[in-house]
Amino acid sequence: MRLLNIFTTLCLLLWSGAATNDGLTDVVEWDPYSLTINGDRVFIYSAEFHYQRMPVPELWLDIFQKFRANGFNTISVYFFWSYHEASKGSFDFETSGKNVQRVLDYAKEAGIYVIARAGPYCNAETSAGGLALWGSDGSMGTLRTNNAAYYQSWQPWIKEIGAILAKNQVTNGGPVILNQVENELQETVHSATNTLVLYMEQLETAFRAAGITVPFSHNEKGQRSQSWSTDYENVGGAVNVYGLDSYPGGLSCTNSNSGFSVVRNYYQWFSNYSYTQPSYFPEFEGGYFTPWGGSFYDECQSELDPSFPDVYYKNNIGQRTTLMSLYMAWGGTNWGHSAAPVVYTSYDYAAPLRETRQIRDKLSQTKLIGLFTRVSTDLLKTDMIGNGTGHSVSSTGIWSWVLRNPDTQAGFTVVQQASSGSRASVTFDVYLNTSLGAVTASDVNLNGRQSKILVTDYNFGNHTLLYASSDILTYGTFDVDVLVFYLEQGQIGQFALKTTSKLTYQVYGNSVFAANSSSTSTSQTFTYTQGAGQTVVQFSDGALVYLLDQPSAWKFWAPPTTSNPQVKPNEQIFVLGPYLVRNASISSGVAQIFGDNDNATTIEVYAGSSLTSIVWNGVSLSATKTKYGSYSASLPGTESRVISLPSLTNWESANSLPEKETSYDDSKWTVCNKTTTLSPIAPLTLPVLFSSDYGFYTGQKIYRGYFDGLTYTSINITCSGGLAFGWSAWLNGVLIGGNTGVATATTTNAVLDLTNFTSVIKSENNLVTVVVDYHGHDETSTAKGVENPRGILGAFLVPKPSASTGFKLWKIQGNAGGSANIDPVRGPMNEGGFYGERVGWHLPSSPSLPSDSTPLIGLNTSGISFYTTNFTLALDSDLDVPLGIKLSAPAGTIARVMFWINGYQYGKYVPHIGPQTVFPIPPGIINNQGSNKLALSLWAMTDAGARLTDVELVSYGVYESGFGFDRDWSYLQPGWDEGRLAYA
């Protein structure tokens, strides 16, 4: 460690001059300490966000405002190629949820930077990792290399998306500050002629040709290789700012004591491989995904615990990290068929901001770190002074990181338990070096999985903290300097102000607060025990100090008065109490505050002496001035607001699998007649039955195969649809088997016994109908990735004829229009091949269905039924009421369910696999005021049939909001037209 410190220190000394840039712009620069934007150092606190997972553009701003309010100044965004190029050469960057410019405009409006991640490969648990699905037929060549076919495939994408990103760079007044090239591409061979090196150089050339001038970045896939850093074996393809992805939690949804072991060698890693660049985490664990058959996110308390950000994110700060992006900050929904097979409909990810857009305690704790780093400019240039167990502390049970700014001598000591997963409460002393000599911060307590950042020589406005043992939340410079600390209730805090005067003070609140006898002629020390709620200390020199317990800190807000992502201490207002403060301004003494609230509370605003009144969401509050200069008022909650959700009744229904009957006319279907394929996976039988070879890339597929003869004893069928998929087969309308699916199988085979169906078999024109479910295309972490075929991989009759499969003809049907993207608003991954989908029964204003059966009655045999109902909502326009659909089925039910709200497929429910049973639906997909259409498909996979026991609208919460969720969403909900009948 000592040799490494010496080496790193020498590097930093050699780098003490001007920051480095990419030679194309000096607006964004970097050095070993931090990123610099427009000449100012900035701590990049970034939130990963995927607009594809929220198809309502207006709600992007809702989410961005919540990010900004909770301390983030940046979003990291994947741009999924698959979402924008449904068929080769046909790009869509403008229609509804695919409007990239609106993403960037809303980011700028919200006051946050953008790190652009346009791939072309992204991973992200999205189908095919974001590669265009038209390449699933094998036509892209060798993926993620400099292969000529692959180059020709991705180049138009980079040209198109690159041009949009280029005009939105910070150099042009936009929000884009970094451009990531590719994604977690491991440089396993450091050779200038290696295909990956050549591929990276191709990509960088293409991005530059598209107009990108901001620095390039990349994300190392964990500490597994050393890739694309100019500081380590740079043979070509290196980026400007190296980054390391890390998901270190090791947490278990079923064992809360599992994992929680922090990584303490990040500092060494960055010192070895990117020592001329700032330490950057393009993806750090904001949560983690759960698979089919796993635990649902709401059940995973270990991942949701606010102690995770408190310990892990401060651990990163202790290792000199100044760029950190949380994956995910908001996960969203894998609506339609957009998910990769490793995940199901919900992509909540146990992220700080829930899929429902609700603030979790985890986000509230994450905010405390964001607001601290926003104003702590001395943190942006620090050297490692030392670290280790028992370092600068009185206990070997404590690990510390000690950092110091070489220019200002401000210090930051991060403490955590040496065994980071410990739940013990430990008290110890910390030995600090200050400008006035060594001091001891006594009685520092860590209550289990907790971390603290102690500061020395910390400037806030015209004041300086000699040291503090409490965590700083933030500070502001108003008429006076206002400092905010937080601790858990009952913990002891200590701080010393540098002053030559003997300060007097007034205490407002119930924390026990006192001056220490150890005060000197140059500093004055104070000790307190944190009480419940907030305490305010007003000093005689004008300084104001808020002492908050953790719940109060979670409801503390510092809305900026500037749209600049870089917020100065004098560009904010302090607000305490509400559930959320979106933004605020002050003019002529009036604080105009917009936000959301749930429970009745007291709102307190500190904005300096000019403040005279408070307006909340346009309503003037009866406010009273406090003795220390803030204003407070009662803020009503929503406890008394009545939310009435209708029961889902008056169902209509129809058969959605007429294709299993021999009388069905398939004359317009696509004939499977190919005997060769570009796929790297060889078909098991011919003709090729891979669905992508016939232009059906997404959703369920239906096959009809014909054979003659009475002598066959079985049919051997192999299908692939992604993890947890299933398939069913009918012979002349009678179920003969299939595979109901298991969570761990992507491909399954079954030998379907025909000996019990002799009465069904005919001498000629026997029909086998096969329905194959689809759970997305694989990411490249799975063998051939997107090129792993979907649908039927092989089928033959037994006994197998010597020169054939026994089948004389196969036909295929998939989503209406195939790759034509006939519903551009909802996009290319919304629909599959069920009859009800093809003819548009899920769309608003579609024709009535002939039966009045309900999904609660269901089917008494195998098959697929389609159900629709309409309902009306009348939620008050000033409310945000996150809604969802709850589904349940009797124990032992073997079935597959999908449902659509106003045409959007927003849930896949597989009761025999799980785990999801409740599905959030955002405003814009559902109309909070007005009519809605719910459609549901029920696929009974056995002759026992299937039914549901519950289809219910549910509410996740009620919030009075200043955002405005009562809008005309009709442009997002195009209705049915007769053209759909062509796909019957």
UniProtKB/Swiss-Prot annotation:
Compartments, record wording: Secreted
Is Secreted given among the entry's keywords? yes
Question: Which Gene3D superfamilies does the record cross-reference, listed alphabetically?
Answer: Beta-galactosidase, domain 2, Beta-galactosidase, domain 3, Galactose-binding domain-like, Glycosidases
Q: What is this protein called?
A: Probable beta-galactosidase C
What InterPro entries does this protein's entry cite?
Betagal_dom2, Betagal_dom2_sf, BetaGal_dom3, BetaGal_dom3_sf, BetaGal_jelly_roll_dom, Galactose-bd-like_sf, Gly_Hdrlase_35_cat, Glycoside_Hdrlase_35
Q: What keywords sit in the KW lines?
A: Carbohydrate metabolism, Disulfide bond, Glycoprotein, Glycosidase, Hydrolase, Polysaccharide degradation, Secreted, Signal
GO biological process, alphabetically ordered: galactose catabolic process; polysaccharide catabolic process
Q: What is its main location?
A: secreted
- Domain of life, per lineage: Eukaryota
Q: Name one GO cellular component term.
A: vacuole
Signal peptide per UniProt = 1-19
A GO molecular-function annotation: beta-galactosidase activity
Which residues are recorded as binding substrate? 78, 123-125, 183, 247, 349
Key word Hydrolase present in the record? yes
Relate the protein's function as given in its record: Cleaves beta-linked terminal galactosyl residues from gangliosides, glycoproteins, and glycosaminoglycans.
